[in-house]
């Protein structure tokens, strides 16, 4: 063992050993408990960022800890390689997406290896290869044959800049989440998978996910959006077909004064065809896409269609308005409006001079006032004919029953969740394996003709997908007849919805090898960002149920435990140029002056300009405040970067990047290295004789085993990695001060250092590997995690505080099993206590076992 800790040489040597020994390559082993740990795989953007490093360090710490628990641990890695950034980069760099992607994969793979992550590289794959997406294509055709896939023309969010469809959740403030272009509505044929058929199960099974954060489960519950209500029919004057409406408040039915319909509703389109002004309004509504969350605050706009609906129970005519707050893809695209009891309806009615008829009053019988605002609470019905006096649930049931009896409605369950639109009008994605013959019939591509391969040698013009532009590519045959291929590609969430399962058998000649998949699945620990709560994590749960129902897996859920790591923040600085726009300056190019409290007083960039500090914000390219992990590894070593990442903040909270903190982690690791080196250069140690230890030695050993117990719980159960490291640091402070004079002192230090080195191993595997060897042990990668000695935690002696009239006057060292009488006798005869009791009469003596002797005297 070298005297100086030199991470660069050490880490490369140990990484080569792991590669050569295939340390982390695993196979199924029925004799061992398995543990499958997975971090969300990266998009090969070109370079790792600190968010990646944090995610993958957490996963590696969990994996290495579980391996030392004796489990058969699989930790795979791969590449989420399809997607729009590759197309944009290809246009910018005048290349094709494929070579750009593969070059990035090679570069990032080397970066991951330099950080010492214990991946089973034999399972690596990239989702953009036909060997991967071929099985996705075949599974899609199986879903089609089962009736779970369909194609329909639908109104979609269209980004005119990226020339692609966006999911609702990819629309932010009416603009594309990627390029900030205003989103338009466009009708195009789309492929859908029927996730709605699994909505109830997806909702119910959230209750089985005890290892998931409550916040993620709540977000999914809200996204699925189950509600119980009534679907009812309003007849429409002059129309054969009734207008179907869904409501969760049938108790307010007698207060309906108009019906609102979406701009895309067939009735709206029919009326707009005869009314140019209405047509212009519906077009405006279509192209002003709003997220559901914004409906409450947006300005309510509408226009009378001229059509009249007939109230299903009292026969009253009410106007039908096209309203900008009614969504076509929720419920039926039509709402019954009750202005007196719904604030949105109230604002609309007030604006357009429509009737406001209250029919619900508070349960205490007091009058309801709707002169300024709607009364939205549940209460008791009035002015509702035969339903007067009924409370909410009774009214709900009675009105639903009457509607059903008259054939005008029924109770129903509705979900906010829509079927999953998987078509994308992009090139760099997996081709959808469907063809259309000349008679207009659509067919899945037969399995023996899969994969439908995406051509990689293409030229990108930034506008049209090469497979759409190349008319020859689409030409094919089906059963000997001419046919055209589908030129849309899959939403890239398709690939990431089942990759976790493919890792179990990446070479299988099917989507999965059921035997291997059922050994490894479900994933025991999944690590990734909370931004994926409603898309990737929901789609993966859905895909797992599809795989189960196809007979590939037996489990119901893909991920047992989920850890959502916090973001990595960094200081951001900007300079305002002559045009008044902000130029973001990299923190590494800024010199900082701080006040006594550590706050930034002044910041100057490398050109001598004073720059403004914008605070600690998420690392991003746009703010130029990212820190290159490569530079940090080159400067401090991978172990130091890993240790800082795990120590600086709880794993699920934001982490503030401070180079001073990295320097602190480096100093600590050097102190551990120094103590191990000093200890090992003194030669071998004799066996530890626990029975012969002195009081001080027992106390130190107790600290060692308390630390083992705490670190084991913090990493294994609580996942508070930062407090585990803090406990090891605290122990190291004691070990640095511990005497080394006697043979038993050295034997005790030997036991303690071995425990410290193994406890640090998940965070700092390279340094621990070398120190473990120096301590005379072999291969830390396969050693056992230290177990704490319960006997060592038992204290032989206890310190009892003596209080006289509420003030600390003495401390007693007593045997751990001393009786109350013995403690009282010692306390009342203690030399210090006697001084303060001189001349006083003892009135009361109270003993708190093992802690305190309280004497009251006057």
From Swiss-Prot:
GO terms, molecular function: aminoacyl-tRNA deacylase activity; ATP binding; leucine-tRNA ligase activity
Residues the record lists as binding ATP: 621
- SUPFAM superfamilies listed in its UniProt record: Anticodon-binding domain of a subclass of class I aminoacyl-tRNA synthetases, Nucleotidylyl transferase, ValRS/IleRS/LeuRS editing domain
Query: What is the scientific name of the source organism?
Result: Aliivibrio salmonicida (strain LFI1238)
InterPro entries hit by this protein = aa-tRNA-synth_I_CS, aa-tRNA-synth_Ia, Leu-tRNA-ligase, Leu_tRNA-synth_edit, M/V/L/I-tRNA-synth_anticd-bd, Methionyl/Leucyl_tRNA_Synth, Rossmann-like_a/b/a_fold, tRNAsynth_Ia_anticodon-bd
| Keyword annotations of the record | Aminoacyl-tRNA synthetase, ATP-binding, Cytoplasm, Ligase, Nucleotide-binding, Protein biosynthesis
What EC number(s) does the entry state? 6.1.1.4
Listed Pfam families: Anticodon_1, tRNA-synt_1, tRNA-synt_1_2, tRNA-synt_1g
Against CDD domains, the record matches this protein to: Anticodon_Ia_Leu_BEm, LeuRS_core
Q: Which reaction does it catalyse?
A: tRNA(Leu) + L-leucine + ATP = L-leucyl-tRNA(Leu) + AMP + diphosphate
- Signal sequence span is none
The molecule here is called Leucine--tRNA ligase
Family as reported in the entry's similarity comment: Belongs to the class-I aminoacyl-tRNA synthetase family.
Motif 'KMSKS' region location, chain numbering: 618-622
Q: Which domain of life is it from?
A: Bacteria
Q: What is the lineage of its organism?
A: Bacteria, Pseudomonadati, Pseudomonadota, Gammaproteobacteria, Vibrionales
């Amino acid at each position: 063992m070298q005297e100086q800790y030199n991470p660069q040489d050490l880490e490369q040597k140990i990484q080569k050993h792991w590669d050569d020994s295939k340390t982390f390559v695993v196979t199924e082993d029925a004799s061992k408990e398995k543990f499958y740990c997975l971090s969300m795989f990266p998009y090969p953007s070109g370079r790792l960022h600190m968010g990646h490093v944090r995610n993958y360090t957490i996963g590696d710490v969990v994996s290495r800890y579980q391996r030392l628990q004796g489990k058969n641990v699989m930790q795979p890695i791969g590449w989420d390689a399809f997607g729009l950034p590759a197309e944009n980069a290809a246009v910018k760099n005048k290349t094709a997406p494929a070579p750009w992607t593969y070059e990035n994969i090679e570069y990032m793979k080397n970066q991951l290896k330099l950080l010492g992550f214990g991946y089973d590289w034999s399972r690596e794959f990239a989702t953009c290869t036909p060997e991967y997406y071929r099985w996705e294509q075949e599974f899609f055709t199986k879903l089609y044959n089962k009736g779970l896939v369909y194609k329909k023309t639908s109104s979609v969010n269209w980004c005119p800049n990226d020339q692609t469809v966006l999911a609702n959740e990819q629309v932010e403030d009416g603009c594309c989440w990627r390029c900030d272009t205003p989103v338009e509505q466009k009708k195009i044929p789309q492929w859908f998978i029927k996730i709605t058929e699994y909505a109830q199960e997806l909702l119910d099974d959230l209750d089985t996910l005890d290892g998931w954060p409550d916040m993620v489960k709540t977000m999914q519950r809200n996204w699925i959006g189950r509600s119980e209500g009534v679907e009812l029919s309003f007849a429409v004057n002059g129309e054969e077909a009734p207008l179907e409406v869904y409501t969760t408040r049938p108790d307010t039915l007698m207060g309906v004064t108009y019906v609102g319909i979406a701009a895309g509703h067939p009735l709206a389109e029919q009326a707009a065809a005869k009314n140019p002004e209405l047509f212009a309004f519906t077009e405006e509504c279509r192209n002003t896409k709003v997220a559901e969350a914004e409906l409450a605050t947006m300005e309510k706009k509408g226009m009378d269609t001229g059509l009249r609906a007939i109230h299903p129970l009292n026969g009253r005519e009410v106007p039908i308005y096209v309203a900008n707050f009614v969504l076509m893809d929720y419920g039926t695209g039509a709402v019954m409006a009750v202005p007196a009891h719904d604030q949105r309806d109230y604002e609309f009615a007030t604006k357009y001079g429509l009737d406001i008829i209250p029919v619900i009053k508070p349960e205490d019988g007091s009058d309801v006032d709707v002169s300024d605002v709607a009364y939205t609470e549940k209460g008791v019905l009035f002015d509702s004919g035969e339903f007067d006096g009924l409370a909410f649930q009774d009214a709900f049931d009675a009105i639903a029953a009457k509607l059903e009896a008259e054939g005008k409605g029924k109770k129903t369950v509705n979900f906010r969740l829509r079927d999953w639109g998987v078509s994308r009008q992009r090139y760099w994605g997996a081709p959808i394996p469907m063809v259309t013959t000349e008679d207009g019939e659509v067919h899945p591509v037969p399995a023996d003709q899969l994969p439908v391969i995406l051509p990689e040698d293409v030229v990108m013009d930034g506008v049209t997908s090469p497979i759409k532009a190349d008319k020859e590519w689409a030409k094919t045959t089906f059963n000997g007849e001419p046919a055209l291929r589908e030129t849309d590609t899959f939403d890239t969430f398709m690939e990431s919805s089942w990759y976790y399962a493919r890792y179990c058998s990446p070479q299988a000649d099917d989507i999965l090898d059921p035997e291997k998949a059922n050994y490894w699945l479900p994933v025991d620990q999944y690590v990734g960002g909370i931004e994926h709560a409603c898309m990737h994590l929901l789609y993966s749960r859905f895909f797992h149920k599809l795989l189960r129902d196809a007979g590939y897996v037996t489990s119901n859920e893909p991920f047992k435990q989920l850890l959502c790591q916090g973001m990595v923040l960094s200081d951001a600085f900007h300079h305002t140029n002559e045009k008044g726009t902000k130029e973001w300056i990299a923190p590494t190019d800024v010199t900082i002056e701080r006040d006594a409290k550590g706050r930034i007083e002044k910041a100057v960039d490398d050109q001598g300009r004073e720059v403004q500090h914008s605070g600690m914000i998420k690392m991003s390219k746009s703010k130029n405040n990212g820190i290159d992990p490569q530079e940090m590894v080159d400067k401090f070593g991978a172990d130091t970067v890993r240790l800082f990442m795990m120590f600086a903040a709880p794993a699920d909270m934001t982490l503030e990047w401070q180079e001073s903190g990295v320097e602190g982690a480096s100093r600590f690791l050097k102190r551990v290295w120094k103590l191990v080196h000093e200890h090992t250069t003194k030669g071998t140690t004799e066996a530890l004789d626990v029975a012969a230890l002195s009081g001080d030695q027992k106390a130190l050993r107790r600290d060692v085993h308390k630390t083992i117990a705490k670190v084991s719980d913090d990493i294994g159960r609580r996942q508070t990695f930062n407090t585990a490291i803090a406990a090891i640091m605290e122990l190291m402070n004691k070990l640095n001060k511990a005497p080394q004079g006697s043979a038993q002192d050295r034997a005790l230090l030997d036991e303690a250092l071995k425990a410290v080195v193994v406890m640090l191993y998940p965070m700092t595997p390279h340094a621990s590997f070398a120190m473990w060897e120096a301590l005379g042990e072999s291969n830390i990668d396969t050693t056992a995690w230290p177990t704490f000695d319960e006997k060592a935690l038992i204290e032989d002696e206890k310190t009892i505080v003596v209080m006289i009239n509420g003030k600390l006057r003495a401390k007693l060292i007593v045997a751990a099993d001393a009786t109350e009488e013995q403690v009282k006798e010692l306390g009342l005869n203690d030399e210090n206590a006697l001084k303060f009791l001189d001349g006083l009469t003892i009135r009361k003596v109270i003993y708190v076992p093992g802690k305190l002797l309280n004497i009251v005297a006057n």
